[in-house]
Amino acid sequence: MASVQLQNVTKAWGEVVVSKDINLDIHEGEFVVFVGPSGCGKSTLLRMIAGLETITSGDLFIGEKRMNDTPPAERGVGMVFQSYALYPHLSVAENMSFGLKLAGAKKEVINQRVNQVAEVLQLVHLLDRKPKALSGGQRQRVAIGRTLVAEPSVFLLDEPLSNLDAALRVQMRIEISRLHKRLGRTMIYVTHDQVEAMTLADKIVVLDAGRVAQVGKPLELYHYPADRFVAGFIGSPKMNFLPVKVTATAIDQVQVELPMPNRQQVWLPVESRDVQVGANMSLGIRPEHLLPSDIADVILEGEVQVVEQLGNETQIYIQIPSIRQNLVYRQNDVVLVEEGATFAIGLPPERCHLFREDGTACRRLHKEPGV
């Protein structure tokens, strides 16, 4: 195991900066996930750690050693890519041992490591098979095994589940989580799928246009996003946003006017520092935090546009006339409502978020479970 530290790391191709002043501390044995939309720089960041991309400026440390100029093979890292990249003419055992053979490892060492890793990944009964005889999930396990037999200090995974169908992704997610718990290796995992990030990570790094938007535990990012980008990216369906105007402030409270015909006002339990009366801000509320109207004091009303019945839950898209945008309401179980009907939902102030015009969040003061 080894720690990974990035200090003011920047990557640029000419005038185009793809990673800017990245500062990260990844501790020994941590499972860290880089997540963000396409083009945010997450794979580039992983490749710089691996040594497959040069660092324009800044410093990379693995353990106590500065690695900027160290060749990839000498960094003690192993990498799994989105593509399995298995040799079709070699068996599972031969694919897994290929790197060790090139490195000149002794046969008994190779056999011991391959058998140990095959047992961990439940591949023992498949060692003699060729890749064409394997399922997608089995091929990905072989690709992971090929990296594990080299016993890297840091394990890098670049969107390893993207080529799998939904059911296999869930299965492999569970297997990767178990593998980390069993081996205790430092793992850095890249994905655009925030569900993978939330379920796998000890710590999530959210990237936006080459910058670190926020670093924290999954539930910290979900309940206390640092800005509107993180709030909208973490969570599915994504957070609802409403334009509001500040009408009053008090200690640890901000009063805002909702964009409704009755101009209803509501006090939000958020930090009021630097918030000015009259300022235009955004109120955020997650679909699953909206309430049935009969148990709430603050009511929003609109017309049902779309109803998605998922069996275990219902997602209702409601158009609020005064703001000409849809809100998404999610409720467990089946909710029977017709498209075109008028539907009212409740807005719980303690579950609301408040964002300034520059996108930064006012710190929420409501204590959420698990954080």
From Swiss-Prot:
Membrane topology designation: Peripheral membrane protein
Domain (ABC transporter) ranges: 4-234
EC number: 7.5.2.1
Keyword Membrane found: yes
Molecular function terms from GO: ABC-type maltose transporter activity; ATP binding; ATP hydrolysis activity
Major site of localization recorded for this protein: membrane
Keywords: ATP-binding, Cell inner membrane, Cell membrane, Membrane, Nucleotide-binding, Sugar transport, Translocase, Transport
CDD domains the record matches: ABC_MalK_N (cd03301)
SMART domains: AAA
Residues involved in ATP binding: 36-43
Catalytic activity: D-maltose(out) + ATP + H2O = D-maltose(in) + ADP + phosphate + H(+)
GO cellular component: ATP-binding cassette (ABC) transporter complex, substrate-binding subunit-containing; maltose transport complex
Subcellular location: Cell inner membrane
Pfam families (alphabetical): ABC_tran (PF00005), TOBE_2 (PF08402)
Purpose of the protein: Part of the ABC transporter complex MalEFGK involved in maltose/maltodextrin import. Responsible for energy coupling to the transport system.
Cross-referenced PANTHER family: MALTODEXTRIN IMPORT ATP-BINDING PROTEIN MSMX, MALTOSE_MALTODEXTRIN IMPORT ATP-BINDING PROTEIN MALK
UniProt subunit comment: The complex is composed of two ATP-binding proteins (MalK), two transmembrane proteins (MalG and MalK) and a solute-binding protein (MalE).
Family to which this protein belongs: Belongs to the ABC transporter superfamily. Maltooligosaccharide importer (TC 3.A.1.1.1) family.
Protein name: Maltose/maltodextrin import ATP-binding protein MalK
UniProt source species: Shigella flexneri serotype 5b (strain 8401)
Gene that encodes it: malK
